[in-house]
């Protein structure tokens, strides 16, 4: 009873401190580590680090060799934060084991143990060392004998005054265990003084011993002898986990012994093992359990062998496998803690509370790594440590035990203010006050105590569960919690909503690629609740906010229909519509099958190929939900334009046919094949092409066409044809066979033309008469044989040039730029040469040969008009006949002088008068220059404004009268006429159409500029009359 009252008094403190969790235990973030300190006067202070977190901040204590350090009694030790500073350290006073303790109101923790040692090495004694005398070929050991020291040493030797260390090899070895220098067999070059150098790495100091002289004895050379092992490793070695182990083995002997190693249990040497150059050192890095066992060193030479062996024993300091964790328990509960650590040897366990060792007593049971405390009370709160220890190390696991005692409290975990449930659903209202020990729970609805029933259940954890909720269950509910320290209560409301129902779910659909569909998803729900629609496709959410292609949500608040536009094959699958409210999640699923053209067939193979056929096989691709009904085979060659459908056997390839023979191929052509599948929906994508293969060769079966020829020189027969394209040549070694014979004979002459590109053959024979007819046919051949021949065609041999010149040649000038040449036709025969036409040559006196004009006319034409000549110039002309062989002799030249140039000045001062449909024109006579032809008359050119047809009126006078209907504007110009041709035209005059009024006009032109200078209206009588 006294304890109960004490707890009541302590409750405020417990709640504000432990219960509220404001205090936190110390946790080390830095612990002291082992230190080997160099004994050097320049180093005046040692720092052993120790830092811990916690609230309030911990204070620190230190132990040396298990005894508390009293910082008030000496300045030698001081606290630096939580770290220990040792000033002017001394070996006799400060060497030992140190531990840091961190304490706050929650408790105390003890750090790992840290060892402080001092590294040093003294000087060698200065006395002279004795001379070592040996025979040549004998083995010898030079002792180093290091001075007193602490810390790891390394050894090296020098020879005479050389600054370089003696290099180790199969004959010489420096032991890093003893420092001694070993010679397996002494040679004359070894004679001299040897000095041992010793370095202490931790003390940062090296010392040098006195020299040891080595001399050779004079009483002979040492004979051969078997190896004697002088450097051997211990029989038993303790090897720590992950450490690097080195075993030394060296032997004296003559000849120099070879060193080798093995494991006595027959296991292979680990691959990680390293050897020194001489094999005298075996190193095992990162030593593990599987590396332990017996190792043997073998030293051998021609005289025998010797052995050394030892055992490596694996050990490991403790490592945690299971640590203890912070635990918060109610008063009178029981504590069970267990910690486990691995190690070799197995560790033992010790338990500590606030840095003090725990022992078994009435309520406390300790067995190996387990701790049990029954009937917990407040005084059991604190920091506990499990220490796992073997002879190599001690490790600590730390945790806090907090024992709690309080009346029920809802401040941190009150009843939910509003709980919402749907009609027909189940609801659980949690009641979890903080109470130590656990409180008993009762419930009220409104002001009435609630009793259990089939629908109303009180759960073990204190929660209230109501099943198959109705509207009448809505209201206020209160949880009342009680323990020996007091009671507490908390209330919340229950709101009941109508259920949500999917009224129109999506249903299974069969659609075709490219269509658009709507999947319905419509619900009825409580009007006070928001509804969220989410669609899934094959398990993945459709994110409509990102504007995913094809998908669109349509509908209002209670409608979540999904539209799929331009549906594709990849849209086949399961569509899940989920409807979410704050209370529940409903879903409905539908399968959508999208049918489309078949996928591309696969694995198209050419099983066999001949000259005109190919056997193919393939595997069907996906039918895309519509059975394949037909296959089509297509081919492509280097000569085709794209892919072409081909004939097959069988002719129709139904959807169950997966092989066929392609027929009608061209021999000796490279083909690719592909297969296309079709179904009710359409034609699918083609397969990948097969490998490129060439059909077998065959005799060519297409004869050349368009057999022709003729021409060429005398005694030549020229034969031409259309070349056969490569795809019809049917094989290698392709060429042409040309066969011909004179008409009326029976024997064929036969020639081969090996050039594939050739389309012409010329046969020469002096006996061939001009224009002799020949029967000609052309065939083809290749390495497989001769193929088809063309039909017979008549081709004439070459002919002679015409032998006769034309007679009766004459020439006449028509204008300043035109003349006409005439001649008599030649009556030709086979002897005088065939005439196909005539060639007219013309030139001037000073024409160069390259400037001679040539014009040809064909057939029996005997005149030729030549234009584009120069005015007032003498031209010469002659005529000659031509045929396919060339041109014949020219006629005698004739000449003519072209007319002078036509007048250069146009008619000027043109006046006009328009009356009804009569137009009166008047202009000045044109005067010509000396080098121009005389004016013989004038041409009047007129046309309606919107028409292209021009009318011409010629006159010898300087006036004219035109009768024209003037429904539209007229355009008029006037030019001169002379022997030299038409002269320059006046500027175009526009005569406007007139409806009722008469009008007159004048155009004044300067002869030099021909520009319009004035337009006016005048009376016709002022310039009259047009007729004389």
From Swiss-Prot:
PTM-bearing positions, type Phosphotyrosine: 882
Tissue specificity comment: Expressed in brain. In brain, it is preferentially expressed in the accessory olfactory bulb, layers II/III and V of the cerebral cortex, piriform cortex, anterior thalamic nuclei, locus coeruleus of the pons and mesencephalic trigeminal nucleus and in Purkinje cells of the cerebellum.
UniProt keyword list: Cell adhesion, Cell membrane, Disulfide bond, Glycoprotein, GPI-anchor, Immunoglobulin domain, Lipoprotein, Membrane, Notch signaling pathway, Phosphoprotein, Repeat, Signal
Record GO cellular component, one term: side of membrane
Lipid sites, type GPI-anchor amidated serine: 999
Glycosylation sites recorded in the entry for this protein: 65, 193, 368, 377, 468, 659, 765, 860, 865, 895, 931, 956-957
A Pfam family: fn3
Span of domain Ig-like C2-type: 32-117, 122-208, 227-308, 318-402, 408-502, 500-587
Positions of the pro-segment in this chain: 1000-1028
Membrane-topology descriptor: Lipid-anchor; GPI-anchor
Cellular localization per UniProt: Cell membrane
CDD domains per the UniProt record, alphabetical: FN3, Ig5_Contactin
Disulfide feature: 50-100, 144-196, 249-297, 339-386, 431-479, 521-577
Signal sequence region: 1-19
InterPro entries in the cross-refs: FN3_dom (IPR003961), FN3_sf (IPR036116), Ig-like_dom (IPR007110), Ig-like_dom_sf (IPR036179), Ig-like_fold (IPR013783), Ig_I-set (IPR013098), Ig_sub (IPR003599), Ig_sub2 (IPR003598)
Cross-referenced PANTHER family: CONTACTIN 6 (PTHR44170:SF38), PROTEIN SIDEKICK (PTHR44170)
Quaternary structure and interacting proteins, as annotated: Interacts with PTPRG.
Family as reported in the entry's similarity comment: Belongs to the immunoglobulin superfamily. Contactin family.
Cited function: Contactins mediate cell surface interactions during nervous system development. Participates in oligodendrocytes generation by acting as a ligand of NOTCH1. Its association with NOTCH1 promotes NOTCH1 activation through the released notch intracellular domain (NICD) and subsequent translocation to the nucleus. Involved in motor coordination.
Record protein name field: Contactin-6
């Amino acid at each position: 009873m006294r304890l109960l009252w004490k707890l009541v008094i302590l409750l405020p403190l417990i709640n504000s401190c432990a219960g509220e969790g404001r205090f936190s235990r110390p946790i080390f973030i830095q612990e002291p580590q082992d230190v080997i300190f160099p004994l050097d006067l320049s180093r005046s202070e040692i720092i052993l680090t120790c830092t811990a977190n916690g609230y309030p901040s911990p204070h620190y204590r230190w132990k040396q060799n298990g005894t508390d350090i009293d910082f008030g009694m000496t300045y030698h030790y001081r606290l630096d934060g939580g770290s220990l500073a040792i000033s002017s350290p001394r070996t006799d006073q400060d060497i030992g084991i140190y531990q840091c303790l961190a304490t706050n109101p929650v408790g105390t923790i003890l750090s790992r143990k840290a060892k402080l040692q001092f590294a040093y090495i003294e000087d060698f004694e200065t006395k002279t060392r004795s001379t070592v005398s040996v025979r040549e070929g004998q083995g010898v050991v030079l002792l180093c004998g290091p001075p007193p020291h602490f810390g790891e040493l390394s050894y090296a030797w020098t020879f005479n005054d050389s600054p370089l260390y003696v290099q180790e090899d199969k004959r010489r070895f420096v032991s890093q265990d003893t420092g001694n220098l070993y010679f397996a067999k002494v040679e004359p070059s070894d004679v001299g003084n040897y000095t041992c150098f010793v370095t202490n790495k931790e003390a940062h100091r090296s010392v040098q011993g006195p020299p040891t002289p080595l001399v050779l004895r004079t009483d002979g050379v040492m004979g051969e002898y078997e190896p004697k092992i002088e450097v051997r490793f211990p029989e038993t070695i303790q090897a720590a986990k992950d450490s690097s182990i080195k075993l030394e083995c060296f032997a004296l002997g003559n000849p120099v012994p070879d060193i080798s190693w093995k494991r006595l249990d027959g296991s292979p040497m680990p691959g990680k093992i390293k050897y020194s150059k001489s094999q005298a050192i075996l190193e095992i890095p990162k030593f593990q359990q599987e590396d332990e066992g017996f190792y043997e060193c073998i030293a051998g030479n021609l005289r025998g062998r010797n052995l050394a062996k030892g055992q490596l024993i694996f050990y490991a300091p403790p490592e945690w496998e299971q640590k203890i964790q912070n635990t918060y328990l109610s008063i009178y509960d029981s504590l069970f803690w267990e910690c486990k650590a691995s190690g070799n040897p197995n560790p033992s366990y010790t338990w500590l509370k606030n840095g003090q060792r725990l022992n078994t007593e009435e309520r406390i049971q300790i067995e190996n790594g387990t701790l049990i405390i029954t009937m917990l009370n407040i005084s059991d709160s604190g920091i506990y440590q499990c220490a796992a220890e073997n002879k190599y190390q001690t490790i600590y696991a730390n945790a806090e035990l907090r024992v709690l005692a309080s009346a029920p409290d809802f401040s941190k975990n009150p009843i939910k203010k509003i709980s919402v449930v749907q009609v027909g659903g189940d609801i659980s209202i949690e009641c979890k006050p903080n109470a130590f020990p656990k409180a008993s729970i009762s419930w009220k609805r409104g002001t009435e105590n609630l009793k259990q029933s089939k629908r109303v259940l009180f759960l073990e954890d204190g929660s209230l569960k109501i099943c198959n909720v109705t509207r009448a269950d809505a209201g206020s509910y209160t949880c009342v919690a009680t323990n020996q320290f007091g009671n507490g209560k908390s209330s919340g409301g229950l709101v009941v909503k109508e259920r949500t129902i999917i009224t129109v779910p999506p249903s299974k659909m069969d659609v075709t690629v490219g269509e658009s569909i709507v999947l319905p998803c419509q619900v009825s729900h409580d009007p006070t609740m928001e509804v969220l629609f989410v669609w899934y496709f094959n398990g993945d959410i459709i994110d409509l906010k990102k504007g995913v292609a094809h998908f669109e949500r349509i509908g209002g608040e209670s409608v979540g229909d999904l539209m799929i536009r331009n549906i594709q094959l990849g849209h086949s699958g399961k569509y899940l519509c989920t409807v979410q409210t704050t209370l529940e999640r409903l879903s409905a699923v539908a399968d959508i099958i999208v049918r489309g053209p078949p996928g591309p067939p696969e694995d198209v193979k050419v099983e066999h190929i001949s000259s005109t056929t190919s056997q193919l096989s393939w595997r069907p691709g996906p039918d895309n939900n519509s059975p394949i009904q037909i296959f089509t085979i297509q081919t492509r060659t280097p000569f085709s334009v794209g892919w072409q459908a081909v004939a097959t056997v069988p002719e129709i390839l139904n959807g169950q046919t997966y092989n066929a023979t392609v027929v009608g191929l061209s021999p000796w052509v490279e083909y690719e094949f592909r297969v296309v599948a079709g179904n009710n929906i359409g034609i699918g994508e083609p397969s990948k092409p097969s490998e490129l293969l060439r059909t077998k060769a065959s005799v060519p079966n297409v004869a050349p066409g368009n057999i022709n020829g003729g021409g060429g020189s005398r005694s030549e027969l020229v034969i031409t044809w259309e070349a056969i394209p490569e795809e019809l040549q049917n094989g290698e070694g392709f060429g042409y066979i040309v066969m011909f014979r004179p008409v009326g004979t029976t024997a064929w002459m036969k020639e081969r033309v090996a050039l594939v590109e050739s389309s012409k053959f010329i046969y020469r024979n002096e006996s061939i008469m001009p224009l002799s007819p020949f029967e000609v046919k052309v065939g083809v051949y290749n390495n497989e044989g001769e193929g088809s021949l063309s039909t017979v065609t008549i081709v004439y041999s070459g002919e002679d040039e015409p032998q006769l010149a034309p007679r009766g040649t004459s020439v006449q000038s028509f204008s300043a730029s035109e003349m006409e040449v005439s001649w008599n036709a030649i009556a030709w025969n086979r002897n005088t040469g065939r005439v196909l036409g005539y060639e007219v040559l013309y030139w001037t006196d000073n024409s160069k040969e390259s400037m001679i004009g040539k014009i040809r006319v064909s057939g029996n034409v005997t005149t030729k008009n030549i234009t584009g000549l120069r005015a007032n110039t003498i031209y010469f002309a002659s005529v000659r006949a031509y045929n396919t062989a060339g041109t014949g002799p020219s006629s005698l030249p004739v000449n003519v002088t072209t007319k002078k140039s036509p007048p250069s000045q146009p008619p000027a001062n043109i006046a006009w008068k328009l009356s009804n449909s009569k137009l009166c024109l008047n202009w000045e006579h044109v005067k010509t220059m000396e080098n121009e032809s005389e004016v013989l008359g004038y041409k009047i050119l007129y046309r309606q404004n919107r028409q292209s047809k021009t009318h011409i009126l010629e006159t010898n006078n300087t006036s004219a009268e035109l009768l024209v209907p003037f429904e539209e504007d007229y355009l008029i110009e006037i030019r001169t006429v002379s022997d030299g041709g038409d002269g320059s035209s006046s500027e175009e005059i526009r005569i406007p159409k007139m409806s009722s009024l008469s009008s007159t006009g004048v155009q004044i032109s300067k002869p030099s500029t021909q520009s319009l200078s004035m337009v006016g209206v005048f009376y016709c009588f002022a310039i009259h009359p047009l007729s004389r």
